[in-house]
Amino acid sequence: MSSSRSVYSSSSVVGGSPYRSLSSAPRFTPGSSAASVHAGAGGSGARISVSRVSTVGSGFGGGFSGASNVNLFGGVQNEKETMQDLNDRLASYLERVRSLESANKKLEVQIRQHTEKKGPAKDWSPYYMTIEDLKKQVFNSIVENSQLVLQIDNARLAADDFRVKYESEVAIRMSVETDIGGLRKLIDDTNISRLNLENEFESLKEELIFLKKNHQDDVNELQAQIASSAVTVEVDAPKSQDLGKIMADLRAQYDEMAQKNREDVEKLYQSKVEEHTVQVNLDAEALHTAKSSVTELRRTMQSLEIELESLRNQKASLEGTLHDTEARYAMELEMLGGTAMALETELVQVRNDCQRQQQEYQALLNTKMKLEAEIQTYRRLLEGDSFDLQDAVPVVTTQTVKKVITTTQRLVDGKVVAESNNTEVIKS
């Protein structure tokens, strides 16, 4: 007695490649079964055929032969049920493979559409060159700002030096003006002394004239008395002196004294006048020198004030330029930070997509390996090898995925100018 059964189903494709063809030549042995599995490549049909041939020796009795036929029929029926169950399971697995294939194709279409929508892979090297150029510009700007700050400090120090010089020159000017005031007071005192001496000289001259007049009056009066006197006195006495001679001597003495006094007064007056003239000349020369110094100091002060004003204007201009430069580079840094954050976010999204696709591919690969293992199990079963039901049970594995997100922020003056996220997936 022999029985045969054939099951036809479609083949499956996992990961874009068909399963390999499995075939086994039928083996015919007494009291055993022969099976063959044919799986077409490239989507062709698969056939599982089972045949059982049993031979009974002619020397046995009919009763034994009937019992053997009953037992053999029961064994064949059990094998049919087992094969039916296995075929159903295989069909369900193949159906699952087809569904996974269709899902894989859908994912490939979605990935292709997403890639086409996003366009070709971007070349980031121009951005790197731009970033390097911007870094160099920022560095050069920092150096320029440092130089400007140094120039501002130098200008401030120069302005402080000019201010100190200006204050010292003002102090010198005030002291010179004080000296000029003292010299003017001295000139006034000298003029007063000169006027006093002139007055004294005039009074002495008047007194001299008055003395001369009195002396002449006395002489005239004495001569008149002598002339009017008629008394002649003769005494025996020493010879009297000549009054005319005495008067002449007195007149000569008075004239000599008056001339001497006049000369002394004139000499004193000339010496005083010469001293005051020298002093006045010295004071005038000092005054002229002081005026020249004051004029020079005033001119220097005006030039210093002009230079100070120009330095202030230059400082204000440099500060405005520095402020504009800082604002412009802060804006550029903010724009670059936003671009870098967008690029990093896109990079993280691409990495996550790659990891998700890798996980899906790994799941499909595991399913393919399970199906290949089950096909090998079917093959061993159909070839007559020992079979354990646990070999057909799919192995359930548990995988723990740990995602670590690292956020890096760049702070400038307490403000976030750049932020990057790095996602790391750890499987265990």
From Swiss-Prot:
Residues 247-384 are annotated as: Coil 2. Residues 385-428 are annotated as: Tail. Residues 79-389 form the IF rod domain. Residues 2-78 are annotated as: Head. Residues 131-222 are annotated as: Coil 1B. Expressed at high levels in notochord and low levels in adult liver. Residues 79-114 are annotated as: Coil 1A. Residues 24-45 are annotated as: Disordered. GO terms for molecular function: structural molecule activity. Residues 115-130 are annotated as: Linker 1. The keyword Coiled coil applies. It comes from the Eukaryota. The record marks 236-237 as: Cleavage. GO terms for cellular component: cytoskeleton; keratin filament. The keyword Phosphoprotein applies. One of its GO terms (biological process) is intermediate filament cytoskeleton organization. When phosphorylated, plays a role in filament reorganization. Heterotetramer of two type I and two type II keratins. Keratin-18 associates with keratin-8. There are two types of cytoskeletal and microfibrillar keratin: I (acidic; 40-55 kDa) and II (neutral to basic; 56-70 kDa). Belongs to the intermediate filament family. This is Keratin, type I cytoskeletal 18-A. It comes from Xenopus laevis. The lineage of its organism: Eukaryota, Metazoa, Chordata, Craniata, Vertebrata. The gene is krt18-a.
